[in-house]
Amino acid sequence: MSVRRLAEDTVQPAAFAFSKENAAWAEATIKKYPEGREQSAVIPLLMRAQEQDGWVTRAAIESVADMLGMAYIRVLEVATFYTQFQLQPVGTRAHVQVCGTTPCMLRGAEDLIKICKKKIASEPFTLNEGGTLSWEEVECQGACVNAPMVMIFKDTFEDLTPERLEEIIDRFEAGKGSEVVPGPQIDRVYSAPIGGLTTLQAPEPVEEKKSVRASKAKDEQAVSVPPSNAAKPSTATDVTNPTLKTPATARKAAAKNVKIEGETVDKSKPAKKPR
């Protein structure tokens, strides 16, 4: 991971203070966290400071640290760790982040970088003459299916061509960036296929509506079936089973009187051995 440091002292402002509106927002944000956990608001407060000034200054880091009762080094660690925080001045009207990861690169990200070099500056993190525009190459921004794409502040502009990116940069430079609709720049809806859906186009089946009278008549015609014991476990035993004529306890005594094919068993004769 590359080392991230604060900007030179020559460009650092002497002080930082939230605007009245942002100060009220910051106080409300801090109160959302439990007592003793207020330091968890460090990331949203740093992000709001960046939105206000365009980048995170040393004075902003110190101000946020004082608000949260944190050591300066702890807030500095957060600001330098996350690449979403800009640590040096960027364009006041647009900072273009060009995705250069594999999907976007295969779809033409290099051509978008050429446009940035042409329209803004030859090197990343370099302001144009008016200080209104800057650019950088970043890693994946999560819109791979709509590659290539760029992010300007919080908005993504996808399915770009070099010509379309050039038009977008011109609009931001003219102070009309809010007029550019973010998202796919072609006839695509979010991440749907180009040209529209190719599947799931059949209309949903409409369930046939039945009258209450017909449903009631059908219910009356239904034959009631008595409950079945098929699924119930058997609790019958040799003693309680009604299909057995003689209980198990009396079988030995009853065997003396059993007749086999009309003949009485003679106990005086030895029993035949089984073959």
From Swiss-Prot:
Binds 1 [2Fe-2S] cluster. Residues 243-256 have a biased composition (Low complexity). SUPFAM superfamilies: Thioredoxin-like. One of its GO terms (molecular function) is metal ion binding. It holds the Pfam family 2Fe-2S_thioredx. Residues 200-275 are annotated as: Disordered. Its EC number is 7.1.1.-. Keywords: 2Fe-2S, Iron, Iron-sulfur, Metal-binding, NAD, Quinone, Translocase, Ubiquinone. This is NADH-quinone oxidoreductase subunit E 1.
